[in-house]
């Protein structure tokens, strides 16, 4: 069997090299799903790809890194991840992905990211270079962030602190009560489950209505107006400046 090495290129790892311009040469460069250069070269300046192709024009004095036996692939992005927010599910102190409360739009996931998480180097070794970390728990859980899985601290790792607001739509599944179920294992009646589900949906409507009312009140510039963090976090969502991601599993 023919064996070969595969390299997933994480440019931010090569801090010393990136001080100037660098040309990376490789046996194969997978630029896009349909664009491949064999062999190929990549010109990088300050961590940004400037040119890519079978052969690029190397600026005078730039560093040449020859990886002739390796293959370069784009890094993967892990969407809707708890990377850096959770370590061991069985230990509550290591889980920062869930906040207390059902409506917490002012929660920002990047603040709780642990840059020393043992899961980060494992993900990076498998080709994942970035992750969209999402707060979980409740109905409106907060704002996700895009982080790079390389850096000395959370500030350096964070690419975008505010990606989107996340809303977890109430489950529509109904559990059929069993005649022999007792105690905590006995589910509520079908009518009670439907009532609870409808109530959760009404609470979402009410929350957005209150956020809109806050927006209009603030626009009127009343005296002694004090900002409220939760409603302030909703303003860019209501104005369309920040997207909202709705999670619906059923």
Predicted regions and their residues:
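Bacterial N-terminal signal peptides
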Residues: 5-16
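Histidine-rich, glycine-flanked metal-binding segment
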Residues: 33-73
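Polyanionic/metal-chelating signatures
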Residues: 119, 124-250
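Short N-terminal segments immediately surrounding and downstream of signal-peptide cleavage
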Residues: 21-36
């Amino acid at each position: 069997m023919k064996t070969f090495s595969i390299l997933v290129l994480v440019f931010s790892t090569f801090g010393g090299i990136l001080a100037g311009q660098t040309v990376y040469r490789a046996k194969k460069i997978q630029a896009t799903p349909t664009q491949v250069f064999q062999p190929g070269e990549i010109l990088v300046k300050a961590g940004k790809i400037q040119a890519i192709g079978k052969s690029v024009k190397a600026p005078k004095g730039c560093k040449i890194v020859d990886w002739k036996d390796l293959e370069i692939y784009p890094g993967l992005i892990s969407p809707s991840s708890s990377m850096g927010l959770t370590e061991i599910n069985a230990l509550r102190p290591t889980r920062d992905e869930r906040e207390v409360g059902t409506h917490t739009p002012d929660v920002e996931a990047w603040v709780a990211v642990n840059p020393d998480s043992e899961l980060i180097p494992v993900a990076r070794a498998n080709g994942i270079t970035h992750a969209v970390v999402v707060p979980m728990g409740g109905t409106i859980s907060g704002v996700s962030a895009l982080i790079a899985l390389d850096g000395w601290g959370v500030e350096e790792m964070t690419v975008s602190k505010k990606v989107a607001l996340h809303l977890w739509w109430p489950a529509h599944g109904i559990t059929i009560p069993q005649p022999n179920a007792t105690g905590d294992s006995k589910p509520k009646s079908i009518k009670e489950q439907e009532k609870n589900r409808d109530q959760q949906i009404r609470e979402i409507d009410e929350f957005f209505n209150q956020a809109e009312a806050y927006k209009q009140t603030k626009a009127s510039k009343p005296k002694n107006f004090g900002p409220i963090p939760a409603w302030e976090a909703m303003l860019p969502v209501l104005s369309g400046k920040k997207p909202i991601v709705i999670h619906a599993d059923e």
